[in-house]
Design a protein with these regions (language model features):
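Class I S-adenosyl-L-methionine-dependent methyltransferase module
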Residues: 27-123, 127-128
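Class I S-adenosyl-L-methionine
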Residues: 1-30, 34, 104, 118-138, ...
Length: 218
């Protein structure tokens, strides 16, 4: 992915920043997500917030019921100490011990954030993110027919319409999805294993794809 003339990379659904942390060659990186506790966690770690190495199940339950006491900690526990990284989707344990996932999640997050020290983290709806002219835009939305953090579904028709608008107004747009409308072309794909729950038999493979908009030719 080559940096555009303006040198700005904008992620509209940054999540855990697995992709964003590997982006290089840009003078400015903007990471957005509508989940305020997630952004509080990322901003906190960026500013030196000390994450815990252990989180007990009792602490997990307490934080789940008192989310606003410490939003950065809530973001970390809600995702990093939950099964499969699902927002407060159940206290996660190591298979071979009764410890939480906190230490491993902390290590992974600190490694991710090591390359994002100068990134700008913002919390907005994806349509409200200020995008500098000529930016590279990356969107990794919730998959079609799945629910987001709060149980809401993304309006996929509206999403793709907005991606077209961004591309048609001078931005370079990349979308990570399983499928896309015909006017978006797949430029990369890879099979990935997924899981619905703790049951190993429920794991399955799907093909993750990267699409970009094909501007109409005259």
């Amino acid at each position: 992915m080559l940096p555009p003339p303006c040198g700005v990379f904008v992620s509209l659904f940054c999540g855990s920043c697995a992709v964003e942390s590997k982006v290089q060659g840009f003078s400015r990186i903007i990471c957005n997500d509508k989940h305020r506790y997630l952004i509080a966690m990322l901003q906190g770690v960026q500013g030196g917030y000390e994450l815990p190495d252990t989180v007990s199940e009792a602490e997990y339950r307490y934080i789940r019921e008192h989310k606003d006491d410490d939003p950065a900690l809530t973001g970390f526990v809600g995702f990093g100490c939950s099964f499969g990284g699902k927002w407060f989707g159940g206290y996660a344990r190591d298979r071979h011990s009764d410890r939480s996932y906190a230490a491993g999640s902390k290590k992974t997050l600190l490694q991710t954030m090591a390359t994002l020290g100068d990134a700008e983290f913002i919390c907005n709806d994806y349509r409200a993110v200020p995008v500098p002219q000529g930016a590279v835009i990356y969107a990794d939305p919730p998959y079609r027919n799945t629910t987001g953090y709060g149980g809401e579904k993304l309006d996929t028709d509206e999403f793709w319409t907005y991606m077209r608008l961004l591309a048609q107004t001078g931005h370079t747009v990349f979308v990570s999805e399983l499928e896309a409308p015909d006017d978006f072309v797949c430029i990369w794909e890879k099979p990935v294993q997924r899981s619905l729950d703790r049951n190993v038999s429920n794991r399955f493979f799907s093909t993750e794809k990267l699409f970009t908009y094909a501007l109409p030719t005259e």
